[in-house]
Regions:
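ATP-binding Walker
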Residues: 27
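NTP-dependent small-molecule kinase module
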Residues: 2-6, 151-152, 166-218
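Hydrophobic/aromatic beta-strand patches that form the interior of the parallel beta-sheet core
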Residues: 46, 65, 130-132, 176-178
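ATP-dependent NMP and nucleoside kinases share a basic, alpha-helical "lid"
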Residues: 70-80, 94-150, 168
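P-loop (Walker A) phosphate-binding loop of NTP-binding proteins
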Residues: 22-24
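Residue-level preference for the first positions of well-ordered beta-strands
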Residues: 16-20, 108-110
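Extreme N-terminal, non-catalytic leader segments
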Residues: 1-18, 41
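N-terminal phosphate/diphosphate-binding loop that engages ATP/GTP or pyrophosphate donors
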Residues: 31-80
């Protein structure tokens, strides 16, 4: 038997997990998410639907699915979202169908949602969910990062700082906490969490058959 055949024979099916990364705006969540997706082919980004205007450089269907309020409200009424919320007067939501398909195929889904979205996901999918909150190294550093965003005016920065304070008060509702002082270290920590969570017994859907195949009783 070749090495490839041995590797195939040792494959144990698993159910994918839902990995939530949350942080206040400017804490580095997007950078960490991008690196994780580049490093790991077994995880894909959940594409949320939003009613906010498209920003320069964004691609419809990749960064977000952009929709008008009427379409969004109809999907809410039809219970087609895993979670949805209103942020800065715009609606955001995660469609159910593509997420469930990915999990059933044994792949993981990365979510970029706030604490409200995380609570809703936890309510309906606790066994599938792993949540991580990313904190900035300091409030001063967070404000500096926000001011560095050309598209955000001073009044917008003030609003985001106020919201950041509120968001950070929910840090203790998450499974894991990472202080993002160094991006590479933060990415490595997320990868370590992901590796361990994938090995949890509850997610090893093919483990029972594997063990029985060795003549071990349940």
């Amino acid at each position: 038997m070749s090495n490839d055949e041995k590797s195939s024979a040792m494959t144990i099916s698993r159910r994918g997990l839902m990995l939530v990364l949350s942080s206040p705006s400017g804490a580095g969540k997007s950078t960490v998410s991008k690196a994780l997706l580049e490093h790991d082919a077994q995880i894909i980004m959940s594409v949320s639907m939003t009613t906010r205007p498209m920003r320069p450089g964004e691609v419809d269907g990749k960064d977000y699915v952009f929709a008008d309020q009427g379409i969004f409200d109809a999907m809410v009424k039809a219970n087609e979202f895993l979670e949805h919320a209103t942020v800065f007067e715009n609606s955001y939501g995660t469609p159910k169908a593509p997420v469930e398909k990915t999990l059933s195929e044994g792949r993981d889904v990365l979510f970029d949602v706030d604490w409200q979205g995380t609570q809703e996901l936890e309510r309906i999918a606790r066994d599938d969910l792993v949540s991580i909150f990313i904190l900035p190294p300091s409030v001063e550093e967070l404000e500096r990062r926000l001011h560095g965003r050309v598209q955000d005016a001073d009044d917008v920065v003030k609003k985001r700082m106020a919201k950041a304070t509120s968001e950070m008060s929910h840090w203790n509702e998450y499974d894991y906490i990472i202080v993002n002082e160094n991006v590479d270290e933060s990415v490595a920590r997320v990868e370590a969490i992901l590796a361990a969570e994938r090995l949890k017994r509850i997610r090893q859907s093919g483990m029972l058959d594997f063990v029985r195949g060795m003549g071990v009783s349940q």
